[in-house]
């Protein structure tokens, strides 16, 4: 059975800069992990790349990854809206209050029932979704850094 893996913004940059990390993702895909991301992640990547002199080169590489890995691009739905709203009302984790974009990335992965959320953001890894969402049967994907995902893929 295929596992759904959502990539946060930084993971794409890691893969663009490291052949070893690209190879890891190729192994994951060969082992039935399916890669997902969102329109918001793509937009954030483009905004970050625009600040760099190598914009065209990076953008070409990024779009090549989207195609090569057959990444599913998620769009907003009612579940994303509900989760984003509940995240915005949750003031229990002070690290996440100002992190609207990061919370939205996690909302996409949660709404679309992704099994894993891969990120380099420690606050997202430790973040506990509001109890109200758990009671509504939303489940936070297992949230891991790329190194932990590597151990999972290679096991």
PLM feature spans:
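Active-site neighborhoods of divalent-metal-dependent phosphate/nucleic-acid chemistry enzymes
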Residues: 72-126
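Short, conserved catalytic or adaptor-binding loops enriched in Gly and charged residues
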Residues: 26-29, 62-68, 133-136
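Acidic, PIN/NYN-like endoribonuclease modules and their adjacent C-terminal/linker elements
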Residues: 1-2, 112-155
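Short, hinge-like loop/turn segments at secondary-structure boundaries
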Residues: 52-56, 91-92, 133-137
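Short, well-structured N-terminal submotif of metal-dependent ribonuclease cores
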Residues: 1-37, 49-61
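General small-molecule cofactor/ligand-binding pocket signal
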Residues: 36, 72-75, 142-144
């Amino acid at each position: 059975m295929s596992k759904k893996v959502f990539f946060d913004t930084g993971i794409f940059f890691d893969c663009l800069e490291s052949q070893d990390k690209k190879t890891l993702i190729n192994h994951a895909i060969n082992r039935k992990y399916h890669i997902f991301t969102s329109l918001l992640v793509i937009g954030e990547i483009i905004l970050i790349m625009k600040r760099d002199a190598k914009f065209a080169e990076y953008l070409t590489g990024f779009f090549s990854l989207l195609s090569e890995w057959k990444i599913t691009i998620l769009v907003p739905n009612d579940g994303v809206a509900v989760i984003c709203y509940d995240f915005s009302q949750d003031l229990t984790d002070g690290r996440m209050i100002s992190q609207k974009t990061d919370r939205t990335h996690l909302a996409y992965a949660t709404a679309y029932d992704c099994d894993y959320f891969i990120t380099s953001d420690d606050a997202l890894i430790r973040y506990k979704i509001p109890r109200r969402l758990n009671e509504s049967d939303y489940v936070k994907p297992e949230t891991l850094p790329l190194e932990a995902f590597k151990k999972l893929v290679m096991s």
